[in-house]
Swiss-Prot record:
Record's keyword terms, sorted: Amino-acid biosynthesis, Aromatic amino acid biosynthesis, Lyase, Pyridoxal phosphate, Tryptophan biosynthesis
Organism of derivation: Rhodopseudomonas palustris (strain TIE-1)
GO MF term set: tryptophan synthase activity
UniProt xrefs under InterPro entries: Trp_synth_b_CS, Trp_synth_beta, Trp_synth_beta/beta-like, TrpB-like_PALP, TrpB-like_PALP_sf
Annotated function: The beta subunit is responsible for the synthesis of L-tryptophan from indole and L-serine.
Disulphide connectivity of cysteines: none
Family: Belongs to the TrpB family.
PANTHER family noted in UniProt: TRYPTOPHAN SYNTHASE, TRYPTOPHAN SYNTHASE-RELATED
Name this polypeptide is given: Tryptophan synthase beta chain
SUPFAM superfamilies cross-referenced by the UniProt entry: Tryptophan synthase beta subunit-like PLP-dependent enzymes
Subunit structure: Tetramer of two alpha and two beta chains.
Catalytically driven reaction(s): (1S,2R)-1-C-(indol-3-yl)glycerol 3-phosphate + L-serine = D-glyceraldehyde 3-phosphate + L-tryptophan + H2O
Pathway listed: Amino-acid biosynthesis; L-tryptophan biosynthesis; L-tryptophan from chorismate: step 5/5
Amino acid sequence: MNQALPNSFRSGPDERGHFGIYGGRFVAETLMPLILDLEKAYAEAKADPAFRAEMDNHLKHYVGRPSALYFAERLTEHFGGAKIYFKREDLNHTGAHKVNNVLGQIMLAKRMGKPRVIAETGAGMHGVATATMCAKFGLECVVFMGAVDVERQQPNVLRMKALGAEVRPVTSGANTLKDAMNEALRDWVTNVHDTFYCIGTVAGPHPYPMMVRDFQAVIGQEVREQIMQAEGRLPDSLVACIGGGSNAMGLFHPFLDDPGVAIYGVEAAGHGLDKLHAASIAGGKPGVLHGNRTYLLMDADGQIEEAHSISAGLDYPGVGPEHSWLHDVGRVNFLSATDTEALDAFKLCCRLEGIIPALEPSHALAKVADLAPKLPKDHLMVVNMSGRGDKDLASVAEHLGGKF
């Protein structure tokens, strides 16, 4: 914590993909040429105005951006403190923030001449976004999904199949997101010649954490413009949920060098931090998983522990390496919310705002319930409403015994 602070919190990663001691490229030798190819292709695409122009066109006409910045009037009134705004990523085509990143990666796959795309998915939102973009751009799509998640996210499984994707249930480990990612990496090693791996969060080997962050930064860039229009100044705080952390990184990154903006990331505390949870920063330590060094849930022998969250999208035993670094340098405050707190926030948002939030951003809303009442009425707080909750209704009904 006492390390010298950087001149900018936005300059990472270095050329080897490190954010301080985190990140990097811990991959099998067979994958190294692919990773280097991808890095080169991404650098070229980033420097190509035609790539950016095409992407902006699809974001506007296909995804439906910019997404609204909405003043949550009744929630603000209810808490009696900070003025709360929602960044409405739930209104994007496919229903979450995931599509911002997938559009960029699928355009890159097309540019690299890869006809086959693989992806891992937890809640199914990244899988749906990938299947959607593969259909739009005419690419083959295979999605790896833990068998447990296939059960609890049936609507999304059906959406992926309707869009022409093959969904492969993964029955190893805890049958959830970590295991789906393991399988996807195995498939990639086997099919290096024709396959593009579309990772759904700011994790994995470099350049993925940087690339996904760059594609998601459209969220925070829009918020800067929208809040200036609405309030004439920048927000005082930002709040977002964290699984791997791509929705949060998309909101946070454009504000990291604004010292007046407090930033809160909310992890999933599951049944409690002393029990089963998915809060890698609150309850983990640095280690290596899925190609990068970051905070992980590990036992005393360094074995990866199973994560638990009511939300399939936060149920991951790690976190993006840039978040790990931002925690260590003290720029982002990491909090956590339990399953029960998230369910309470879910119900409150439905009843007060007429918005059914996904269980993921319900974790962020749960901490808004703690933070907002203690803040003055002129405090501007922006919460990332990262996805809609249709996919979670069956699961929520089950937890609430059928009584909403």
